[in-house]
Curated annotation (Swiss-Prot):
Subunit composition and interactions: Interacts with LY96, TLR1 and TLR6 (via extracellular domain). TLR2 seems to exist in heterodimers with either TLR1 or TLR6 before stimulation by the ligand. The heterodimers form bigger oligomers in response to their corresponding ligands as well as further heterotypic associations with other receptors such as CD14 and/or CD36. Binds MYD88 (via TIR domain). Interacts with TICAM1. Interacts with CNPY3. Interacts with ATG16L1. Interacts with PPP1R11. Interacts with TICAM2. Interacts with TIRAP.
Superkingdom of origin organism: Eukaryota
Signal peptide region: 1-20
Transmembrane segments: 588-608
Chain residue numbers at which the record places covalent cross-link Glycyl lysine isopeptide (Lys-Gly) (interchain with G-Cter in ubiquitin): 754
InterPro entries: Cys-rich_flank_reg_C, Leu-rich_rpt, Leu-rich_rpt_typical-subtyp, LRR_dom_sf, TIR_dom, Toll-like_receptor, Toll_tir_struct_dom_sf
Organism classification: Eukaryota, Metazoa, Chordata, Craniata, Vertebrata
Principal location class: membrane
Gene: TLR2
Record function comment: Cooperates with LY96 to mediate the innate immune response to bacterial lipoproteins and other microbial cell wall components. Cooperates with TLR1 or TLR6 to mediate the innate immune response to bacterial lipoproteins or lipopeptides. Acts via MYD88 and TRAF6, leading to NF-kappa-B activation, cytokine secretion and the inflammatory response. May also promote apoptosis in response to lipoproteins.
Statement: the UniProt record of this protein carries the keyword Lyase: no
LRR repeats: from-to residues: 54-77, 78-101, 102-125, 126-150, 151-175, 176-199, 200-223, 224-250, 251-278, 279-308, 309-337, 338-361, 362-388, 389-414, 415-437, 438-457, 458-478, 479-500, 501-524
S-S bonds: 30-36, 353-382, 432-454
Keywords of this entry: Cytoplasmic vesicle, Disulfide bond, Glycoprotein, Immunity, Inflammatory response, Innate immunity, Isopeptide bond, Leucine-rich repeat, Membrane, NAD, Receptor, Repeat, Signal, Transmembrane, Transmembrane helix, Ubl conjugation
Name of the protein this chain belongs to: Toll-like receptor 2
């Protein structure tokens, strides 16, 4: 018994382990190219069953705590491994040993307290390594990255425990495109620790305090292209001129992101610009200036310029004491060499005239997302302001009058590119004044409803997208590029108004079609973007778009953005894939063919009706319908005649002199209905026939060659035949007055022919001795 329990327990463990492995393997989704996605699946270990077919593995944002030597040993072709945002605290020495093709490794935001160089000793082709956000204090006891000659992006450090950088830490690295060091609590920086890296394209340094900043700058200033400082309080920053003044520098760009300045520390930064002579571009992003802008007592007057800085960018500048801020007149002299200035989303409402006049080299000015209005723009664009300015961006400010804006900018004689988009102009006056060299104008998202001659005739590029325009009828002889997407245009502009247009973007309007002739009329058009419209996929439109192989070279968004809106059965389909039926595309031909077919059908029907007596059948149907309105059989008391006699006029002698004598003078006499004497004069013949038949007990047909040929007999039979033989009774008595060929009976009397073939009829005997028997049989038939 104990042995049986032990066996059952072992099998249960095996089954549960297998199910667990199967569940983990199923939590991965892999595509045919070997890209496996397992992020955010609540995994607590690396799934088993991974093979050499896996080339990219994403296990980020899980609960993995451990990476073992065998977890990834079969993934020999793995190129990308993402293990970020887990709970990994242990990585065995040979965990990545078999990943010789690995190019991207992310171990960020785990719980690694120690780093080992043995992890990376076989990763010769590794290009990207992210170790941010772990718990380590240093980068290990030995050189961590000496086996990574192809590494181009490296991210190390954390915001709390990483406190030391030593000289050995970056040994073996000669060139990095990007190096990010998160060292908010850095306490020890050994000089020359970063100097071993011969070239760094972009260094991102997170520091809380600037105590060690100058020491780091000394090591990198000769090997760095772009230096980015983040999350730093520079209130106590002091720049030592002696530390850098005698060194050659390669830094071309400085970026300050989420950095705090005071008036004093800002002056120290300006000194840095002056001494690091290679700096061409400076950017302040989401920074805070804790001062009032009073630099007069801070020896700023001894600095004549901002070094070689040509581009200055300021985004989201916060000034807590904004309403106490000085006029910045002390920094005006420093701006003479600056060529490009961007001050975005920083509550700028005025550029003082004097500052504008000092910006003598300025070619590009971007004041987007600020508070500029026509009143303040008048002061900013004063006489002699920005004398070489070519591009002015006033996007999303508080401008309201297009006419006044153009007039205020007349002082800018060299202005050729103006962006005043996202201002609420609403309307456009008939005439405006603009600087004489204007070539580019951006009026997108300004809520204008129509375009007028206000626009300068010198324009080469015009952007009026995202407005309420329903037409474009301006003559702009020099316009080369037109951006008019997201409006309400129903058709392409007239090409004669835009003779040199080469680029047109007119997507997301309400255009429903365009033709080859329209496109050909734009003789210089090279690029057209017209997707996102409600196209009517007519036969002509589909024939044009699907038949032009070169159309894709002109339509940049072809074919995915071109969808049918109608007809309904192709709605939503790509224009390239839509198909219409023959009847939709050749309606005239189909209608003509249908008319011809109908004519032939009518002609054939007429021939058949004539051949098979169709008119007779219709007349019979009409007579029958009329008769149907009356009782199918007259009440017994309405029977007035013993028999109705249908006969040919040429057989009247036999009927009137023999039959009448034998029947009406018999005792008791029979009462016969003869059309000559008993039809009511003036009554419609149809009613006479129908009434006579209905009031007669029997109907006697006197058949002969004359009967078959007689038009009168045919006429009687035309209107009596249907009712007599539709009732399936024995009311008809056939008398064959003379032998006739059954084939001579018309085909339309099919039931009469059938009766003659299936029922007995009376034949008039030539022998007088047999005639008495004939009359006896006839009287008996009438009485039956």
């Amino acid at each position: 018994m104990p042995r049986a329990l032990w066996t059952a327990w072992v099998w249960a463990v095996i089954i549960l382990s297998t199910e667990g492995a199967s569940d983990q393997a199923s939590s991965l989704s892999c595509d045919p190219t070997g890209v496996c996605d397992g992020h955010s699946r609540s995994l607590n270990s690396i799934p088993s069953g991974l093979t050499a077919g896996v080339k990219s593995l994403d296990l980020s944002n899980n609960d993995i705590t451990y990476v073992g030597n065998r977890d990834l040993q079969r993934c020999v072709n793995l190129k990308t491994l993402r293990l970020g945002a887990n709970e990994i605290h242990t990585v065995e020495e040979d965990s990545f040993f078999h990943l010789r093709n690995l190019e991207y490794l992310d171990l960020s935001y785990n719980r690694l307290s120690n780093l080992s160089s043995s992890w990376f000793r076989s990763l010769y082709v590794l290009k990207f390594l992210n170790l941010l956000g772990n718990l380590y204090k240093t980068l290990g006891e030995t050189s961590l990255f000496s086996h990574l000659p192809n590494l181009r992006t490296l991210k190390v450090g954390n915001s709390n425990s990483f406190t030391e950088i030593h000289e050995k830490d970056f040994t073996g690295l000669t060139f990095l495109e990007e190096l990010e060091i998160s060292a908010q609590n850095l306490q020890i920086y050994v000089p020359k620790s970063l100097k071993s890296i011969q070239n760094i394209s972009h260094l991102i340094l997170h520091l809380k305090q600037p105590i060690l900043l100058v020491d780091i700058l000394v090591d990198i200033v000769s090997s760095l292209d772009c230096f980015e400082l983040r999350d730093t309080n520079l209130h106590t920053f002091h720049f030592s001129e002696a530390s850098i003044s005698e060194m050659s520098t390669s830094v071309k760009k400085l970026i300050f992101r989420n950095v705090q300045f005071t008036d004093e520390s800002f002056v120290e930064v300006v000194k840095l610009f002056n001494y690091v002579s290679g700096i061409l571009e400076v950017e302040f992003d989401d920074c805070t200036h804790d001062g009032i802008g009073d630099f007069r007592a801070l020896s700023l007057d001894r600095i004549r310029h901002l070094g070689n800085v040509e581009t200055l960018t300021i985004r989201k500048l916060h000034i807590p004491q904004f309403f106490l801020f000085h006029d910045l007149s002390s920094i005006y002299p420093l701006t003479g060499r600056v060529k490009r200035v961007t001050i975005e989303n920083s509550k700028v409402f005025l550029v003082p005239c004097l500052l504008s006049q000092h910006l003598k080299s300025l070619e590009y000015l971007d004041l987007s997302e600020n508070l500029m209005s026509e009143e303040t723009l008048k002061n900013s664009a004063c006489k002699d302001a920005w004398p070489f300015l070519q591009t002015l961006v006033l996007r999303q400010n508080r401008l309201k009058s297009l006419e006044k804006t153009g007039e205020l900018l007349l002082t800018l004689e060299n202005l050729n590119n103006l962006d005043i988009s996202k201002n609420n102009f609403l309307s456009m006056p008939e005439t405006c004044q603009w600087p004489g060299k204007m070539k580019q104008l951006n009026l997108s998202s300004t809520r204008i409803h129509s375009l007028t001659q206000c626009l300068p005739q010198t324009l080469e590029i015009l952007d009026v997208s995202n407005n309420n325009l329903d037409s474009f009828s301006l003559i702009l002889p020099q316009l080369k590029e037109l951006y008019i997407s997201r409006n309400k245009l129903k058709t392409l502009p007239d090409a004669s108004f835009l003779p040199v247009l080469s680029v047109m973007r007119i997507s997301r309007n309400i255009i429903n079609t365009f033709s080859k002739e329209q496109l050909d009329s734009f003789q210089q058009l090279k690029t057209l973007e017209a997707g996102g419209n409600n196209f009517i996929c007519s036969c002509d439109f589909l024939s044009f778009t699907q038949g032009q192989q070169a159309l894709g070279r002109v339509l940049v968004d072809w074919p995915d953005d071109y969808r049918c809106d109608s007809p309904s059965h192709v709605r939503g389909q790509r224009v390239q894939d839509a198909r219409l039926s023959l009847s939709e595309c050749h309606r005239a031909a189909v209608v003509s063919a249908a008319c011809c077919a109908l004519f032939l059908l009518l002609l054939l029907t007429g021939v058949l009706c004539h051949r098979f007596h169709g008119l007779w059948y219709m007349k019979m149907m009409w007579a029958w319908l009329q008769a149907k309105r009356k009782p199918r059989k007259a009440p017994r008391r309405d029977i007035c005649y013993d028999a109705f006699v249908s006969y040919s006029e040429r057989d009247s002698y036999w009927v009137e002199n023999l039959m009448v004598q034998e029947l009406e003078h018999f005792n008791p006499p029979f009462k016969l209905c003869l059309h000559k004497r008993d039809f009511i004069p003036g009554k419609w013949i149809i009613d006479n026939i129908i009434d006579s038949i209905e009031k007669s007990h029997k109907t006697i047909f006197v058949l002969s060659e004359n009967f078959v040929k007689s038009e009168w007999c045919k006429y009687e039979l035309d209107f009596s035949h249907f009712r007599l033989f539709d009732e399936n009774n024995d009311a008809a008595i056939l008398i064959l007055l003379e032998p006739i060929d059954k084939k001579a009976i018309p085909q339309r009397f099919c039931k009469l022919r059938k009766i003659m073939n299936t029922k007995t009829y009376l034949e008039w005997p030539v022998d007088e001795t047999q005639q008495e028997g004939f009359w006896l049989n006839l009287r008996a038939a009438i009485r039956s």
